[in-house]
Amino acid sequence: MLKILCVSDQIDPQVYSPQIKERFADVDLVLAAGDLPLDYLDFIISTLNKPLFFIFGNHHTEELRHYKRLWNDPMLQEDKNYMGCGAIYLASKLKIEGKLILAGFGGSMRYNTGPNQYTEFEMYLEIIKLIPSLLWNRLKHGRFIDILLTHSPPRGIHDKTDKCHTGFKAYLWFMKTFKPKFLVHGHIHLYDLCEIRSTQWEKTTVINAFGHYLINTEDQNGN
């Protein structure tokens, strides 16, 4: 059983607090689903001393250039010497942490000329890049993946009708094909305590990590 702290989109005062160690002492892993400053992630890592995996969203992308070449500016190159904040960048990658298999996709649906935005087709291409590794996991570990970390939600699950906050159909295909236990996303801000944060879709529990959210990997319930 693992306890995972998920964060996204806003600096949560319950996390960014002198009491963070007391509140989250039993957390095994941290997932950051985008739109957060890296110094906030650095605070979480340095105080909890737990592995933290992250992706960029469509905001707070100033340091994205250190991790990848931006599609619209060939002069900005991936920086191999950048030390970062100690977190592990997961976008368009697959990682194994202990017995947990994770993958991530950053960014949002393309709605203007800003960085880290994708068309539906471009997101399918990002997924295709990971298929060989996913198939290898199925052969070696008996499953493709445990947790998919995204910024945007899947189409029709927790998303909105405006172009920026529309979810990706590609994630529905990913869940149907590779059956992760969890898909953790951000991007959709929650201002009402009654708004839905967790939805079961086929074999996957889809979770909105806005602010912060805790996952227990044994019972697939969070709070």
Residue ranges and their predicted role:
Residues 20-21, 41-45, 168-175, 195-196:
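Short amphipathic alpha-helical segments and helix-helix/interface helices
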Residues 1, 18, 94-98, 174-178, ...:
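Binuclear metal-dependent phosphoesterase catalytic core
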Residues 6-8, 29-35, 53-58, 90, ...:
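Active-site neighborhood of phospho(di)ester-bond hydrolases with catalytic His/Asp-centered motifs
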Residues 47-49, 85, 201-202:
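Short, structured coil segments at secondary-structure junctions
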